[in-house]
Curated annotation (Swiss-Prot):
It is found in: Plastid, Chloroplast. InterPro entries: Ribosomal_uS2, Ribosomal_uS2_bac/mit/plastid, Ribosomal_uS2_CS, Ribosomal_uS2_flav_dom_sf. CDD domains: RPS2. This is Small ribosomal subunit protein uS2c. It holds the Pfam family Ribosomal_S2. Its main location: plastid. Belongs to the universal ribosomal protein uS2 family. It comes from Vitis vinifera. Gene3D superfamilies: Glucose-6-phosphate isomerase like protein, domain 1, Helix hairpin bin. GO terms for cellular component: chloroplast; mitochondrial small ribosomal subunit. Keywords: Chloroplast, Plastid, Ribonucleoprotein, Ribosomal protein.
Amino acid sequence: MTRRYWNINLEEMMEAGVHFGHGTRKWNPRMAPYISAKRKGIHITNLTRTARFLSEACDLVFDAASRGKQFLIVGTKNKAADSVARAAIKARCHYVNKKWLGGMSTNWSTTETRLHKFRDLRTEQKTGRLNRLPKRDAAMLKRQLSHLQTYLGGIKYMTGLPDIVIIVDQQEEYTALRECITLGIPTICLIDTNCDPDLADISIPANDDAIASIRLILNKLVFAICEGRSSYIRNP
């Protein structure tokens, strides 16, 4: 795996609140190696460990992107949704930021059928065909289109399972993580002090509740993906 310098700055992470964990009563003992202190009733994450695993994750996504691999970013809670969409669009990744529909990856054939329906309805809307239908039929199909846009809009160009999945908040996206594990899809996961660090292929200990923390971690990963894609374009 390529080793590169990703400008991961501990002071920058502190300013973003990456080090703030959950309350000391709400933690997973398996996170002990990633916790450096307790302060005012909350655990403090060891940012040196965060920097190490974030750097490893950046190396992984850079190498994958340089080989033309596809990524999916998953983060559906309100604090993560906008950052996930922005990061994914910037790096030309697929994303899910509203709700992970059970079986989205393990039952890919059903997801693929929904995506075909979604694309067909988008085409009908763009060509004006929907507006030429009876009002009742048009209204029903427009509702379907709106529903599909909400839940599948971020994966509308996906033609197969992703090569790597990046997950924001292990507990919130546990179903997505379990599906990836079942299928053997490599995962990178932000883990707070209440998570299990042994589930994902690379777990990045970080505050998964603060927007600034989520955005910082995603920005580093996205930069690495973009760098990798540039390398792939230059060396096809």
